[in-house]
From Swiss-Prot:
It is an enzyme of class 2 (transferase). Its EC number is 2.8.1.4. The lineage of its organism: Bacteria, Bacillati, Bacillota, Clostridia, Eubacteriales. Its main location: cytoplasm. One of its GO terms (molecular function) is tRNA-uracil-4 sulfurtransferase activity. PANTHER family: TRNA SULFURTRANSFERASE. It catalyses: [ThiI sulfur-carrier protein]-S-sulfanyl-L-cysteine + a uridine in tRNA + 2 reduced [2Fe-2S]-[ferredoxin] + ATP + H(+) = [ThiI sulfur-carrier protein]-L-cysteine + a 4-thiouridine in tRNA + 2 oxidized [2Fe-2S]-[ferredoxin] + AMP + diphosphate; [ThiS sulfur-carrier protein]-C-terminal Gly-Gly-AMP + S-sulfanyl-L-cysteinyl-[cysteine desulfurase] + AH2 = [ThiS sulfur-carrier protein]-C-terminal-Gly-aminoethanethioate + L-cysteinyl-[cysteine desulfurase] + A + AMP + 2 H(+). GO terms for cellular component: cytosol. It is found in: Cytoplasm. Belongs to the ThiI family. This is Probable tRNA sulfurtransferase.
Length: 381
């Protein structure tokens, strides 16, 4: 008997037609990359992906975070022989918790005697004969004994849910506006889960935001890296722009004008590094600048798609995802970001584009943006 991990990938990949092979290859490459510090062997059996791993538990923990993997099963490989399958199925039943079970059989090898239903009945009868306190429940069992008969037979009961989604790196790229808050890391995670490659930009307002605030953002990027691999982080100085806006624009327009500057800078950085889009952690109506009118005015400053994956999510739901992915505790550390230090008491919630453009005429937009882009620091996380 050999213990393996059966990797099941997202059903969406099956729907990719002629492109299915491209998605499978990318997922396989991502799996190999995340297992590079674990001794393993990739085994293919009639379209199924099995991984022989030196450390099963470590392998499970790593594979759970691979986008595109939706389930991991701990399987025992035996010879495709009915007696061997019976013995292993009985062991699985004895190791499982519960008083009811169901046997599910898949015969990829149609030369194996009997139908799938007949094999399930025979295995179920054998388990009942040897474990009298168990009973069969075909509708709502406490546990399953799963059997797949291929070149070998694979028996398993333990299934671990993974992150699902699409293989990372199969759906273009984006530049995430990463602040130190709760929302933006979750937005980045959700885009990455759909296969979008992440790059991040952070706007730093020294000395009003501390070096510790910058370190906090690096830590958040590092947590996201656990799901994606290396991330490019661009750190843009934003103090001079904020000072100019405060000095020359109306106080109730500060936030929306700052957001428009961020959009301009993000788009120029994106263009410079061949990044297709921009992503933000904005949610409709969550704060004053995230009204429908505010988002429309912000968007007007962008020259490429701006994605907002949290747009219809409640704050409680966003916080729940942040806890699940491991960013929440870092996000709530008490360090200010550039969007919170100069917030006006009564920000404009329904800005009008022409009024904002008129206010911006007091600023040398091109010079301010160019200087910020030129002084942007690059880090590989």
């Amino acid at each position: 008997m050999k213990r393996l991990l059966l990797v099941k990938y997202a059903s969406e990949i099956f729907l990719k037609g002629l492109n299915k092979g491209k998605f499978e290859k990318k997922l396989k490459d991502n799996i190999k990359n995340i297992l590079k510090d674990v001794q393993y062997n990739f085994v293919m059996d009639q379209g199924r992906w099995f991984i022989e791993c030196s450390d099963i538990e470590k392998g499970i923990e790593k594979l759970k975070s691979v986008f595109g993997v939706w389930e991991i099963c701990v399987v025992d490989e035996v010879e495709a022989d009915m007696e061997k399958i019976k013995e292993q199925s009985l062991k699985n039943a004895l190791e499982s918790k519960g008083s009811t079970f169901k046997v599910l059989t898949k015969r990829a090898d149609k030369s194996f005697p009997g139908t799938s239903m007949e094999v399930s009945r025979e295995i179920g009868a054998y388990i009942l004969q040897n474990v009298p306190n168990l009973s069969v429940d075909i509708k709502n069992p406490d546990f399953f004994v799963n059997i797949e008969i291929r070149n070998k037979a694979y028996v398993y009961s333990k299934k671990i849910k993974a992150v699902g989604g699409m293989p990372y790196g199969t759906n273009g790229n984006t530049l995430l506006m990463l602040s130190g808050g709760i929302d933006s890391p979750v937005a980045g995670y959700m885009m990455a889960r759909r296969g979008v490659q992440l790059n991040c930009i952070y706007f730093h307002s020294h000395p009003y935001t501390s070096e510790r605030a910058k370190e906090k953002v690096k830590e958040l990027a590092g947590i996201l890296k656990g799901y994606t691999g290396n991330i490019n982080l661009y750190i843009t100085p934003f103090t001079e722009i904020q000072m100019q806006i405060i000095e020359k624009c109306r106080k109730d327009e500060l936030t929306i004008i700052m957001r428009r500057f961020m959009m301009r800078i993000a788009c120029i950085i994106a263009d410079k590094y061949n990044i297709n889009s921009v992503t933000t952690g904005e949610s409709i109506g969550q704060v004053a600048s995230q009204t429908m009118e505010g988002l429309v005015v912000s968007n007007q400053a962008a020259d490429r798609p701006v994605f907002r994956p949290l747009i219809a999510m409640d704050k409680v739901d966003i916080m729940e995802v942040a806890r699940e992915i491991g960013t929440y505790e870092t996000s709530i550390l008490p360090y200010e970001d550039c969007c919170t230090i100069f917030v006006p008491k009564h920000p404009k919630t329904k800005p009008r584009l022409q009024e904002i453009i008129k206010s911006e005429e007091n600023l040398d937009i091109d010079v301010l943006v160019e200087e910020a882009v030129c002084d942007t620091e690059f880090l590989s996380i």
